[in-house]
């Protein structure tokens, strides 16, 4: 995987709960928010500084900064607690690795993904606000709604995934790290990655 896309390795982590957190909840929430914004009798303005995207930019900037700040204690703390593997009967792991992820690596991938996603979503919203006025002036009125929906639905699904992942990260910080694992340790997760044997 290219170096610049490393933060997005979080979405490749395998775990039985990933379907719920990465697919079902984000799609459900994203579609619900999009339907609300597009289906109101008086539509909510989407593009512009004071519109939906303009308001979201400020929130994403704060969330991105929080995610970067969260990486500092995760990557510098050498305590045994973060070095332990993530618990559970089927702990999360990367497709190319045999050993389960340690808590440190899992959280690093999680908050790295959040920081990168916030940066990307801010960039998308800024670009959309810049080009939307020109595109709207050149598109027939009957097609504007569908063009807006084609941008807004994927944007909101990604935003919903970031929101769900943020809550998952907060759960680990506030609760999960204090709970002892119910399964025995397997290997040394903080060691160099071990590829699966063919």
Feature locations, PLM:
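Short membrane-interface loop/juxtamembrane segments of multi-pass integral membrane proteins
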Residues: 88-110
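Membrane-helix interface/capping segments
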Residues: 46, 71-93
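Alpha-helical membrane-embedded segments
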Residues: 146-175
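Cytosolic juxtamembrane amphipathic/interface segments immediately preceding
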Residues: 6-20, 97
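Hydrophobic alpha-helical membrane-embedded segments
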Residues: 57-79
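Cytosolic/matrix-facing juxtamembrane and C-terminal tails of multi-pass cellular membrane proteins
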Residues: 4-11, 169-198
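Alpha-helical transmembrane segments and their membrane-interface junctions
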Residues: 36-37, 112-137
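Long, highly hydrophobic alpha-helical transmembrane signal-anchor segments
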Residues: 16-61, 138-141, 152
């Amino acid at each position: 995987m290219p170096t610049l896309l490393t933060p997005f390795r979080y979405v490749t982590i395998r775990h039985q709960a990933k379907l719920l957190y990465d697919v079902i909840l984000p799609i459900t929430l994203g579609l619900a928010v999009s339907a609300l914004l597009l289906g109101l009798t008086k539509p909510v303005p989407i593009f512009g500084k004071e519109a939906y995207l303009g308001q979201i930019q400020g929130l994403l900037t704060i969330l991105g900064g929080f995610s970067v700040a969260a990486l500092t204690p995760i990557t510098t703390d050498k305590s045994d607690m973060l070095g332990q593997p993530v618990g559970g009967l089927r702990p999360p792991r990367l497709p190319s690795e045999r050993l389960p992820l340690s808590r440190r690596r899992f959280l690093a991938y999680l908050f790295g993904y959040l920081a990168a996603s916030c940066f990307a979503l801010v960039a998308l919203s800024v670009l959309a606000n810049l080009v939307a006025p020109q595109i709207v002036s050149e598109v027939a009125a009957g097609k504007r709604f569908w063009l807006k929906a084609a941008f807004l639905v994927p944007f909101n699904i990604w935003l919903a995934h970031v929101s769900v992942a943020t809550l998952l990260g907060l759960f680990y910080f506030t609760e999960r790290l204090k709970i002892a694992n119910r399964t025995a340790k397997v290997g040394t997760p903080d060691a160099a990655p071990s590829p699966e044997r063919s």
